Regions:
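Active-site histidine-anchored catalytic micro-motif
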Residues: 1-170
Length: 170
């Protein structure tokens, strides 16, 4: 989701997430504010390591009382590893932490990123009649599937249906 094509070189580059609503104008239709936080410099998910997991956990803890849920945009290379690590590091969580991404850059006409992000946000704020989070755990949402963070593996590097939770789906 976080990559756009450089029109001069054709290379994929990260973009400023404060510009996210420019690429997904439908985000304006939500009746609540959407705040963003971006690591500087942005990180390629293939370089993800435990120190970054600790940083994500710290950000969630520092902002826990401000939000109903959290959505983490993540590259697909190591998304399943990050989701699993966060699920154990955030033990006792009572709010959704939804990881999502895309197989195609956000500015591509048929990108899967828009649907993945929009649905992830909806899941992150979903509440039941008792005003409790519907999904109070770390999950991955990808291509119409919501999967437990610590039970998901990447099965395909090219297809939209890139992840699976074979043994313990939601």
């Amino acid at each position: 989701i976080g990559m756009i094509e450089n029109s001069t070189t054709g290379a994929l580059e990260s973009f400023n997430f404060e510009q996210l609503q420019k690429h997904i104008p439908e985000l304006h239709k939500f009746n609540f504010p959407i705040d963003t936080y971006q690591f500087n410099p942005p990180m390629d998910s293939s370089d993800m390591e435990p120190d970054m997991w600790r940083k994500l956990v710290r950000i969630i803890h520092e902002n826990y009382d401000k939000y109903q849920g959290f959505v983490i945009l993540h590259g697909t290379d190591t998304m399943a590893y990050t989701a699993s690590a966060l699920s154990f590091m955030l033990d006792g969580l009572n709010k959704p932490v939804i990881l999502t991404g895309s197989q195609l850059p956000i500015e591509v006409l048929r990108t899967d990123g828009k649907e993945n992000l929009m649905t992830s946000i909806e899941i992150a704020v979903a509440r039941n009649k008792e005003d409790k989070a519907v999904v109070p755990e770390v999950c991955i949402y990808f291509e119409n599937h919501l999967m437990r963070g610590n039970r998901t593996t990447k099965i395909n590097a090219e297809n939209f249906n890139a992840f699976r939770s074979s043994n313990f789906p939601i």
